[in-house]
Every structure is written in structure tokens, then in C-alpha cells.
Amino acid sequence: MITSAAGIISLLDEEEPQLKEFALHKLNAVVNDFWAEISESVDKIEVLYEDEGFRSRQFAALVASKVFYHLGAFEESLNYALGAGDLFNVNDNSEYVETIIAKCIDHYTKQCVENADLPEGEKKPIDQRLEGIVNKMFQRCLDDHKYKQAIGIALETRRLDVFEKTILESNDVPGMLAYSLKLCMSLMQNKQFRNKVLRVLVKIYMNLEKPDFINVCQCLIFLDDTQAVSDILEKLVKEDNLLMAYQICFDLYESASQQFLSSVIQNLRTVGTPIASVPGSTNTGTVPGPEKDSDSMETEEKTAGAVAGKTPDASPEPKDQTLKMIKILSGEMAIELHLQFLIRNNNTDLMILKNTKDAVRNSVCHTATVIANSFMHCGTTSDQFLRDNLEWLARATNWAKFTATASLGVIHKGHEKEALQLMATYLPKDTSPGSAYQEGGGLYALGLIHANHGGDIIDYLLNQLKNASNDIVRHGGSLGLGLAAMGTARQDVYDLLKTNLYQDDAVTGEAAGLALGLVMLGSKNTQAIEDMVGYAQETQHEKILRGLAVGIALVMYGRMEEADALIESLCRDKDPILRRSGMYTVAMAYCGSGNNKAIRRLLHVAVSDVNDDVRRAAVESLGFILFRTPEQCPSVVSLLSESYNPHVRYGAAMALGVCCAGTGNKEAINLLEPMTNDPVNYVRQGALIASALIMIQQTEITCPKVNQFRQLYSKVINDKHDDVMAKFGAILAQGILDAGGHNVTISLQSRTGHTHMPSVVGVLVFTQFWFWFPLSHFLSLAYTPTCIIGLNKDLKMPKVQYKSNCKPSTFAYPAPLEVPKEKEKEKVSTAVLSITAKAKKKEKEKEKKEEEKMEVDEAEKKEEKEKKKEPEPNFQLLDNPARVMPAQLKVLSMTETCRYQPFKPLSIGGIIILKDTSEDIEELVEPVAAHGPKIEEEEQEPEPPEPFEYIDD
């Protein structure tokens, strides 16, 4: 056994090259044990490597590389490893090889990324030896079938050639494509490179044996290529693949922005007429159509004509198909279907609300109960609780009346066709002036009903705001108009809101400032930013500043690094409200990106700013940036949740609620649990609301602590000595937990992984309830129905069943509260003589002996009963439209005997077009009527009796 390498090292001083080679081979064998000793003579080994006449100079490089590796000098080690050429074996599994390969990839990645940002002429040459090792690494991944690893390295090193090759060579091309698309959506922060990757994905998807148009359109949404989407839709219509076109339209509505959809609709309108007038026209933009277009068009016309009950000769069907697609893209269809689902499946437990109503004793809790009721009935159109408690509701005065009236907008969310009729009694009238609070609330409610889908109601709200003379009505009108015209960037709407802002009225200005942001959402409009920031720096009203703080952030929604200059200037402002606006701007610009720079900035402000509101906003904003990876959030905010500053603790609670909304994340709940007993009441409020956001729609099986928290909410509400702030949080939490009749969840991203703009906006404005309770209603924008709705070729709901392959109790509705039984009046105890007591004692002993004899029989009977109790089945059949929770989608399938085939996997959920494989007549689901006030129809007179002959006896 060798105890020293001194003898081998001495051979390096010999003249004979063969002795030196022998020494290097021996040193290579013992370098891991004697590297410290060899390091003293490493210069001799370096000299051998530099001697170009030395035959084994590559071996010298390998030994030197290993010595430097042990010394921790990884850069030198990498340089010598590159010099070792093929002697550096990338397939070796030693720690040395793994480390050097990692360093090699890091170094190569850094050079590739730097080159990507430089113009073509200024790019630095990359060491061919470095590229050689990386290429060997790629080959090793492919040989070992580690395709995901290869894709990851290819994307990091910007090697699109390897990226494409890896996907095509993998044994699961659709799986690799889905994985790559997911990476693009969630992890890529460089927009330019992401677009290049998406173009490659589009090419691969289109070149598949059966092109995957659904995923192509998902890529095109990211690329903001509306023309290509329009071309695909036209191509599908012409190829008689109308059902696929409908499915893509539904997916587009769910994932794309309003501007994108408007552009696609515009493109369809411009090509609609030529398609209709010339069947089989090849005018399809950039997507070439097959030769048999005219035949396919004819068959489509015949089938469509039969559906509409018209003769095929008339042939206006293609235009009719385009109109249907436009109806889907505009959102009209999805909103109607979701409304039907929520009305049909409403499962609200009114007992919870009744108990809360009976327990509340002040106006703040009264308002909270009204808000909770609207959350519980969001989109169900059921105002049963309010109708049953009109006298109690009438206690709401002033701004509480405004909030209560606006809550009807949440209850009737999406009930657009009859919105004006429903709200008629609360809206401003020409004849007699009503309550300003009621009228303002009514206009706000109209905005909530039409949120992000304004249409004709925008002009109505515009006129009402123009004619409003009262600041309260203007407040409600501004909020309503902002919601209805969200993201439209309409100049006339912007100008009117700006006029209202410049009146320098605190109440009007607060709503107008926020509404400006809603209208210009994500537009990055320079003029809007200048107007808003300029006015914010001038005004003396804190309320106006608060509205503008959020409004400014909304203008920069999704703009990422384009918002950096504005963020810098806001963060340096001496006004704490504008610094807070800077935090919200970071949250909106980088929402869902997981951007490290943004996270670092927020964490820095969270511990360094002198203003509590700014620190709280900074921590809250972390939730918006991390929501794509909710499992990361608890570790990021865990220390902040134990901060000495209660505002930071509150912010940490809300960040967890926002980031982990609807996930039932156990780590997040474990962090929130101690915060529900915090000595500061508003921290408890935040923890209670955040816990409900996380546990919305969770059952005891999916999240064991849900019932424990339900009891906690009830305990806080019923405790007379508890603080109003905590009670407000508990009441709101009850409403959130059971939202939409137990049929909605909260998610900041769409089912396909795109950031869901209305949800992000809704949650951000909801967090402003800290300053202004009526803004709580904005949370309704984030409620997403957890449904699967199957549609046939006529876009009607057929009667069909889905099979959920798990026990019904796993995702069941929570059991309703039991109605408490009336207690019998206690009888006054009478005096008992000692003799009577002794006699009774003897009787009891006799009875006890008899009972013991009976026990055996009773035990046998109990066992029989237990045997009779049937075990729970392992599956459940759900009727269309079905309530299916996100976790349940994985175990969902069509029944074996089903006549329908879905156009995309059921595991995605949402609205799915079904292909009918049978010729039989379809059974359709009957639509249900919405609740709410109706115009009384005149009763029809009874028909006169049939003629008869009267015979006198």
C-alpha cells in the first residue's frame, strides 16, 4: 500500500519521456488520495501539458484538471479538462466528471446567452472543445433516453437544433411537446428566445401525422399571432372540421387577451363574406387548403342546412358558422354555459349564513355578511337569502347600502341578457332622484355582471357617468365602467374617466383612478402613465392617490422588463403611496413569471422601507409573481411570517393565500395556522382570509384541516368578545370557502397554463379591501367554475355521463349544517326524601342486571347492521354539465358505452366539444331558468268550455 506519492512525483524530473508518461499514469491512479501532495508539484505537470512535443500532454492535462478540482479551482480544472480531449470521459459517473460537466454547461450557457443578445457581427467565438463536451453530453442523454434532461440543457444553452432533434427522436413525441410547451409558459423569462422556441413547437405540431391545431393555437396566443390563428380557423371550416374550429375558439376565449380575441374576430369578419359567397374559395391567408375543399364545403352546407331547418340551396351556412365562432370568441357562449352550470348545481348551505347573521352585532360585520352571501351565491343568480331577510338587509345605510346593492352584481355575474331589467329598481332614473348610495351600487353591480365582457353596456354606463351629478353615483359609475371596459383601451371611456379624476373630488377620484387602470389594462400607454403619475404627484387627496396607485400598476400588467423604468421612478418617490404603487407595478408586470430580479426587489423593500403599507404591499406582491410554482412560496415567506412587524406578517399571509389559491397546500396552511392566533387582530384577519383562499373547494380527504378551519371561522364569529377585524376576516373566509354554491375555485392561471388576466386583476383589487370594503367584490373576477361541459355539433349540451374513477366522498360537497333541535324547557328539580332515593337506587341495580343479559343479543344485531351497510363504490357517474374539481380531472373518463368522443383530453376540463358517433336522435339537457325578479306576465284567461247541450230533467 502506497503511503506517499513523492517517489512517483520525482519521476517527473527524469529526462526520459517514457518515465514521465509512466509517472503521469501512476499519478492519475492515486490523485484522489494524494492530491494535496501532488498539488505542490502541479506546475511540473502544467509544463508537460504546455510542451507540444510531449506525446502524453493530454494525460498531463487530465491529471492537472483533477488536482485543481480537488483544490476547488473549478475554472482551471475545466480548462485542463478541455485540454484532455477524449481522455475526459463524459460517461464516467464519478463526482469529478459530474462537477466538471456541470461547470462546462454553465460556462457554455453563459457564453451562448451573451452571444444571443449581441448583434451578428459582434458575437464572440465559442471554444470548440467546450461545445464538443456539451454535444457529447447531449448524445449521452439521448442514448440513456433522458429526453427531458436534454430538452432542459438545450433550452438553457439556446441550442434550438438539439431541442428539435430531441423531441423528434424521443419515444413519446406528444409528451415531449407538452413538456416543452409547459417549460415555455412557466420558466422562460426572455421573450425573444421564448418566441423562437414557440415557432419551433408550432412547426413540429403542424408536421405531425395528424396536426395538433389545439396546441398550435396555444403557442400562437403566446406569439400574439392573430393572423395565423384566423387562418387555421378558416382552414378547419373549409376542410369540414367545424367541431375542431369550435373547440379552438373556446380554448382561445379562455386563454387569450381581449385585444387578441377582438383581432381574430375582426379577421373572421373580413373573410366571412368571401367564404359564404364562393363555397370552396381558396382565400385562406397563409395556411394552404387541400384540393377537395369544394366537396367538403358542400357536405358542411348540407348538414348545417338540416340543422337550421333550411333547404341546402340557400347556402348561407358558412357565414352562419363564422357567426357561431364569433359568438364563442366573444365569450357570450362560455358565459351562458357557466351560468347554466352554476344555477343547476348550486349547493349553498344557507344555514351557515343564517348562523352568521344571527351572531353579528355591528355594521362592519353586517357588511361582511352581505359580501360573504354574494361570494357564496356568485353566478348562481339566487338571492334567496336577501329576500328572506329584507328587514335585516334594510339596516344597511350609506356606504353599506352601496356595498349591499353592488353585491347583486356578484350574485348575477354573467347574467347579462336581463341585467338592466334585474337592476332596474337600483339604477338612476330621469323621473325622481333615488338614494345615491343605491344608484352608485347599482352601476357598480352592472360592471360586475359584465366584467371583462362589456359590449353594449359600456355605452349605457358611459352615459350614466356623464349625467351623474352626485360623487357617490360617479364612484359606482366609474368602477362599473372600468370593469365593463376592462382592457379595451377605449379613448372615449379613458377621456371621461380622466375628466372625473381631474375634478379633484376624493370619492369620485378614487374610483376614477382605479378605473383608468382597468380600461388601459396591460396597454403600457405612455400618455396614460404620464397623466396618472403626474396627477398623483399633484393631488392632496389620499383617496385619489390610493386609486391611482393600483391603476398605474394595472396599465403595466404583463409587461415584464418594459415596466422597469417606471418601477424605478416609483420606488424612489418620497410619497409612500407611490412607492406602494411601485410594489403593485412589480406584481402586475412580472405576474406569474417567477422572475428572480423582481423577487429580490420585493424582498429588499419588505425589510427596508420605512412605511408599513409599502412593506405590506411588497410581501403581498410576492404571491402574484410565484403563483405558477405555489410550492415555492411557503419557503420564500416563512421567515417573513415570523417578522416582528405585524404588517409584514399580514402581507406574508396574503401572499400565501394569493399564490397557493385553490391548491390546499399543506405547508402554506401550516404557516397560517399559528397566525390565526396572532396577538394583532388584522394579522388574524389576513390569516383567516388566506386560509379560505387556499382551501376553497377542498374536502376533508384532499385537505384534512378544512373542517378544523370551518369550526375556527364559526368560533371567531360567535365569540362576543372577539375583535371586529378578526370577525370580518372570518365572515369573508366563510363566503370564499363556499363560493359559487361550492362550484367555483380561484386560480390565477387558465386551464391551459396562461395567466388568467381577470383573476389577477380581481385578486389585486380585492386586497385593497384593507382601505375600502366595497372593493371586496372584485374577488368575483377570480372565481372559475370547476366544471366540464360537453357540447354537440349544434353547441347544445347532450345528455352524457362522465366516469370519475375514485370514491364519491373524495370530491363530494361538504355535508350541510344540521338545523339545531329546540331544547325542552328544564323542569325545576323537586325535593327527594332519603327513603325514596334508596328505593330508586335498588330499582336501578335491578335494571342494570337485566341489561347485561340483553347485551349479547344487541351486539349481534349491531354486527348485522354493519354488514348490511354497503361499501362505498370506487367510481361515480357524473351528468353533463358536471362539477369536476381540478384534482379530479386526472381520474375522469368517458363511460365505455358512450356514443360521444371528446375533441381534447377530459383531463384539461372546461368546455369540450363532443363528436357524436351514433346516428340516433340525441337527448339534450334542458336549460334552467335564472332566478331573480321577473316581470309579471298577465295571467291568461281560462278558455271557454266546450259546447254542450243542457237537458232539463
UniProtKB/Swiss-Prot annotation:
Record carries keyword DNA damage: no
Domain of life of the organism encoding this protein: Eukaryota
GO MF terms, alphabetically ordered: enzyme regulator activity; ubiquitin protein ligase binding
Positions of modified residues (N-acetylmethionine): M1
Keyword Acetylation (UniProt): yes
Signal sequence interval, chain numbering: none
GO BP, sorted A to Z: proteasome-mediated ubiquitin-dependent protein catabolic process; regulation of protein catabolic process
Extent of Basic and acidic residues compositional bias: 290-303, 842-852, 859-872
Record-level GO cellular component terms: nucleus; proteasome accessory complex; proteasome complex; proteasome regulatory particle, base subcomplex; proteasome storage granule
UniProt-annotated stretches for the region Disordered: 277-319, 839-881, 930-953
Residue windows of the PC repeats: 403-436, 441-474, 476-510, 511-545, 547-580, 581-616, 617-649, 651-685, 686-726, 729-761
Alphabetized SUPFAM superfamilies for the sequence: ARM repeat
Pfam families given in the database record: HEAT_2, PC_rep, RPN2_C, RPN2_N
Role this protein plays: Component of the 26S proteasome, a multiprotein complex involved in the ATP-dependent degradation of ubiquitinated proteins. This complex plays a key role in the maintenance of protein homeostasis by removing misfolded or damaged proteins, which could impair cellular functions, and by removing proteins whose functions are no longer required. Therefore, the proteasome participates in numerous cellular processes, including cell cycle progression, apoptosis, or DNA damage repair.
Family: Belongs to the proteasome subunit S1 family.
Protein name: 26S proteasome non-ATPase regulatory subunit 1
